[in-house]
Amino acid sequence: MSSTIMVILSAFVAYLLLMIVIGVVYMKKTSSSEDYFLGGRGLNAWVAALSAQASDMSGWLLMGLPGAIYSLGTGQIWIAVGLFIGTVLNWVCISHRLRKYTIAANNSLTIPAFLENRFQDKKRILLLLSSIVIVIFFLVYTASALAAGGKLFNTVFGIDYHIALAIGAAVILCYTFMGGFMAVCVTDFVQGTLMLIGLLIVPLVAYLTLSGSLSDLLTQSGAPGGAAAFLNPFENGERPYTFVEIFSQLAWGLGYCGMPHILTRFMAVKSEKELKKSSMIAIVWDILSLTAACFIGIIGRAYLLPTVLGENGASSSESVFIEMINKLFSSHLGLPFIGGIFLCGILAAIMSTADSQLLVTASAASEDLYHQFIKKDADSKEILAVARFTVIVVSVLAFVIAWNPNSSIMGLVSNAWAGLGAAFGPTVVMSLFWRRTNLAGAVAGIVSGGLTVIVWDYIPLAAGQTLGSYTGLYSLAVGFAVSLAMIIIFSLATKAPSKEITDVFDKVAGK
């Protein structure tokens, strides 16, 4: 192993040890299930904002999005635009109402529990349904994060993908298992800061060291359709983007209001005042990080010449940020330790999402399934033990799903994001803002949204294509629309909610 690799490795080891230390510290402060799942509702503005955004973006931000732009051009920025709009609406419209409502609805600790309490579901249908949806789709989502970690270690250190996968999974498992929500949020705060610094500095320094004009270098790299088409957000290689393609990318923003690992941050902020600060911090972080990630894909195409990723045995395009850091800090600047720190930023993106997803899945399994259906008299410490056991089980299952080294990070994230967004997004929005929404509507929304995504993405037509591949329309857009329609239809076709339910709604709405 070369001295450069050893220096980079030392940065990784130091970073991973810091994450584990944070887990140990918060393990001593975690004594109940409310501490483990929501940190006692004690998050401050900075931790809430950066942990929410870091857990949201994942390795997709530093690998998936830059890789898509590297391969296909700036037409892929519409995903970033959709996500930014979704982030703003989520923080401005959803966060305050959700925090107030979860407290009013029997101090709900999880999204499934909130939905059950919101509609006073005595038969517990919502709790069971939503917990199952979370476990299924978060398994896929967690697998995408582990796959990104495996590719990172494989590319940087030449470690076998499967060994790299095991290392990443083990570290994430350690601090999530020990410290719960506060450990996850504090590590995500550190990781969100590191991600943003890396995203801003690397493309800027790489651009300043280019050996020619960006346009000429893009042409030399064989950019699809030439430099002009590559830099045109309305072009897809040698042809214009269709309305369906742009709409499908913008539709990613619909997913935010259905993401339990993001929504729980809103529930955990300690005051309305802190939540307002969090909103501004999160929105600024989001626009800076998404813009920088797009520039990584563009500048990376020119900077890495003569290498063209994805061709002649080179790394895949999703490794563009990794390759830029290696070339910039190890070859050009001779600062491998600094490069190692920025590579830790990619690891941070991966870990910040995986830990949050593990925690939400653990809460669904222990609080919503075990406590409510299997052992109703379980005390807080027993629920905590079940949650920690769930973290282990889910980590192992996600590890198995991510076993294939050819797994697409973008593909795995896309499927999980669509499933969660379509199942929960319309239901959460309507439960917060439409007084007439009832239990039947909520159940219909979750079932129809989740099933639509599964049918759209996985059930082949006669020709072997799925509806998604045939139409080019993102399943989240279809699932969200179907779910919303079913909520309205079933709510209006069945009995109106009781006065007891609407009184709580009116109280939260300030009527």
PLM regions: where:
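Membrane-embedded helix-loop-helix hairpins and adjacent transmembrane boundary segments
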Residues: M1-K511
